Amino acid sequence: MKLRDATPADAARLDELLTKLIHDEAQYDSNLNGSYVVTDNYLDRIGLEGHKLLLIEDEGEIIAFLYGFLYEIPGMLAKPIAILDALYVEEAYRRKGCAAQLISAFKSFAAESGVCRIELKVLSNNETALHLYEKLSFKETKKYMTMELA
C-alpha cells in the first residue's frame, strides 16, 4: 500500500469515497441523506495552499483518504489550527493501520505549517471512530450540541 498526495486525476474517486463516508455516517445522524451522491467536491481543493488531500492506494486502487485544512482567525487565535475534515477507509482495509498512517501524515503537514493542534468533529455515537481517535491521542476538549426542531 502506498500513501501519497492526491492529484486532480483522483478527484472523482475521492468524491466516491466521500459519498461512502456520508452513507456510513447516516447511521449515526438522522439528518444525513444516506442516498446523497457527492460530485465535484475535491477537484478545486487538490493542491490548494493550506489544504491537504492524502490517499492510500493498494495495487493502484484508492482505498482510503483524508482531507484536512488549516484554519486561522488573525487576532482571535494565537496560532492557526488544522481541521481534519474527512477520513474514510474502505471496509476491507479497516483495522490495518490505514487511518493511523493518514493521520500521521496529516499531523506532519500540520506541524510543518506551524499550527498548534488538530481538531476534528466526530459523531458521539460512532464508537469505532471515537476509539480510533482516542488511541491516536485525540482528546475531547469541546462539546457540540444540537437541538432537534422537526
Task: Go through each PLM region and give its residues.
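Conserved GNAT acetyl-CoA-binding A-motif
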Residues: 110-121
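Conserved beta-strand in the GNAT
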Residues: 55, 61-70, 88
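Glycine-rich phosphate/pyrophosphate-binding loop shared by adenosine-nucleotide-utilizing enzymes
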Residues: 1, 60-65, 82
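A short helix-loop-beta-strand connector motif used in the catalytic cores of GNAT acetyltransferases and
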Residues: 44-55, 83
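Conserved GNAT-fold acetyl-CoA-binding loop/helix
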Residues: 22-42
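A short beta-loop-alpha structural element at the N-terminal edge
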Residues: 2-16
